[in-house]
Amino acid sequence: MSMYYLMAQLPSLDGIGENAPPPITEERFHELCHCFLGKKAQRNLDRLTLAPPRDFEKSGSSLINAWNTAERDLRLALGKMRAEQMQKNFDAGDAAFPVGILQAARTAVEMENPMEAEKFLNHYRLEFLETLRPMDMFSEDSVFYYGLKLKLILRASRFDTSAGKAAYRNIYSSILNGDRLEVLS
């Protein structure tokens, strides 16, 4: 019953434009969730991330596991393709990437404008997340879906062209100098 109360209090994230602010803050979302979720679900919620490590711990949620696997694979594919483009080595492990992830990574790497590449990747991530959307709107996985979507929307709302150029130059220099700042932890 508590899941009904929680989901009924969350504003819809559907149809939010690229530059529109989200209708709820991440802090408020977490406050509401901590009132209604059990301890295990709260732990899973607190571990939601847009940047999972290479060797992430499996959660009790198939949605979180699918998200972490796909996001890790996307980041590794991007790293590998960017390194190949600059004729550098990149250890992507023994990963065999799904075709959709390879196509998205290739498209992003081929884009000349880093901001457009980030917008493309964010759109790709939102589309992928939509494929994971649970049928049951009142399940824990629906809360995790909402949390990940909110994180992606918040991330997109923070895109800043000048800061992006500075970060791009920093990562590019890191690759050329072998500092490996671009590598997943």
Residue ranges, per PLM feature:
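Extended alpha-helical surfaces
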Residues: 1-185
